Amino acid sequence: MSSLFSSFCLVIAIFESVVGLLGNGTIVAVSSTSCIRSKILSSYDVIVIFLSLSRFFLQLWMILDFLLIFFCQPSYYEENLFVTFKTVFIFLNSYSFWFAAWLSVFYCVKVASFTQSFLSWLKQRIASLIPWMLITSSLFSFATSLPFFWDSYNAHSNFTTPLTMTNSSKRITTRKTNLIFLILLCNVGIALPSIMLVFSSILLIRSLWRHTRQMQNNATGFRDPSLEALIGAIKTVFSFLLLYITNFIALILILSDTFVPLSTEEAICVVVVAACPAGQSMVLIWSNPRFRELLSSILHYVNSCVRARCS
């Protein structure tokens, strides 16, 4: 590592990814068990399961990536491991971004009240569109990540062969052009679902806030559980949106190669990218009693085991 601070940030990122693994694993376990018991696979469960699975594998991949950087840094950057890891990282990030957007759209369509004909039509047919959401997300994520592998592999091969004086500048210019194209392609892969999520979240917050104000005007002075639930929903959506935007900005900075590899600035972005998916999984858990109950049981069991060994 280039500095002690970068090493410290890498350790923090690994810890955050482990927390994310625990959170997303909890969500997948609870949702899958619920579907098996009820023998009903709801639209919400499908979206949440695929979102949590994508983030589970993303953070597992990030942990492996961080460990290789920490212990095998020279071979990691000199060989094709870097290309493979970054390509899979882009695919999993794009996939999780898409399903986070679909979850926000689902909340918006199901919870918010609209008068527009398209949104009313979408509200009635959201369940039948779930398979198309899965296919679209998979194809789009694959399409935006695969060219990076091809071009990066070719660029790596070109740089390992001798360059003559007549064509060296041409190759470097071509590589820079290809790199710019890849950066734009990767950014589009996460920008489109981000626009969907921001737009649907704003609509949802606006609808919930309007409904909250109406209930406050009709309140009798006693604590209304429905009103508290609405305020909690607004906080949940806003927290989810804030984490998503923060993750988007940090990821764009990493993919755009804005900072020198292993610099202090990039290390901070890595910590943010590892923290935001874990934070979003915690937001989902604490907003859902089913998820919260299982996580509390797991933490209680772990705490009991630690106390038993220490005593």
UniProtKB/Swiss-Prot annotation:
GO terms for molecular function: bitter taste receptor activity; G protein-coupled receptor activity. Its main location: membrane. CDD domains: 7tm_TAS2R40-like. Residues 1-9, 77-87, 150-178, 257-266 are extracellular. Expressed in the oral cavity, as well as in the gastrointestinal tract, including in the upper palate, tongue, proventriculus, ventriculus, duodenum, jejunum, ileum, cecum and colon. One of its GO terms (cellular component) is membrane. GO terms for biological process: calcium ion import into cytosol; cellular response to chloramphenicol; cellular response to chloroquine; cellular response to diphenidol; cellular response to nicotine; cellular response to toxic substance; cellular response to xenobiotic stimulus; detection of chemical stimulus involved in sensory perception of bitter taste. The chain crosses the membrane at residues 10-30, 56-76, 88-108, 129-149, 179-199, 236-256, 267-287. It comes from the Eukaryota. Keywords: Cell membrane, G-protein coupled receptor, Membrane, Receptor, Sensory transduction, Taste, Transducer, Transmembrane, Transmembrane helix. Changing F181A: Loss of quinine-, diphenhydramine- and coumarin-binding, strong decrease in diphenidol-, chloramphenicol- and chloroquine-binding, decrease in chlorpheniramine-binding. It is a multi-pass membrane protein. It is found in: Cell membrane. Residues 31-55, 109-128, 200-235, 288-311 are cytoplasmic. Signal peptide: none annotated. Gene3D superfamilies: Rhodopsin 7-helix transmembrane proteins. Belongs to the G-protein coupled receptor T2R family. Bitter taste receptor. Binds quinine, dextromethorphan, diphenhydramine, diphenidol, chlorpheniramine, diphenidol, chloramphenicol, chloroquine and coumarin, this latter being a weak agonist, as well as epiquinidine, ethylhydrocupreine and quinidine. This is Taste receptor type 2 member 40. It comes from Gallus gallus (Chicken). The gene is TAS2R40.
